[in-house]
């Protein structure tokens, strides 16, 4: 799923808050990144705004495809429990050094 432009003003405000280092339009163009940051940095009011425009299945998909380094343990567990999903280990970055993955 992707959100269509023009983006709603209330959603732009949430995007600006949770991904402060990008323009909100750029943030909303990458829905999975937006949702991951929302689930960590957003307030319950921010989440309510997003839920008005984004179905719950997209939140689940964002959890299943979460980038490494965004979620903290508390948010990771909270959102998995909210959706009745088993709580896996947090995503980790992997680096290839020669032939070995570290």
Regions found by a protein language model. Name each.
Residues 100-102:
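Conserved small/polar residues in nucleotide/adenosyl-binding loops
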Residues 38-70:
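Amphipathic, hydrophobic secondary-structure cores in small proteins
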């Amino acid at each position: 799923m992707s959100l269509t432009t023009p983006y709603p003003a209330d959603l732009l405000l949430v995007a600006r808050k949770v991904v402060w280092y990008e323009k909100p339009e750029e943030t909303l163009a990458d829905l999975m990144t937006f949702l991951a940051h929302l689930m960590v940095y957003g307030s319950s009011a921010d989440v309510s705004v997003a839920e008005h425009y984004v179905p719950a299945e997209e939140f689940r998909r964002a959890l299943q495809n979460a980038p490494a380094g965004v979620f903290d343990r508390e948010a990771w567990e909270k959102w998995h429990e909210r959706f009745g999903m088993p709580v896996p280990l947090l995503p980790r970055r992997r680096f290839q050094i020669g032939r070995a993955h570290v």
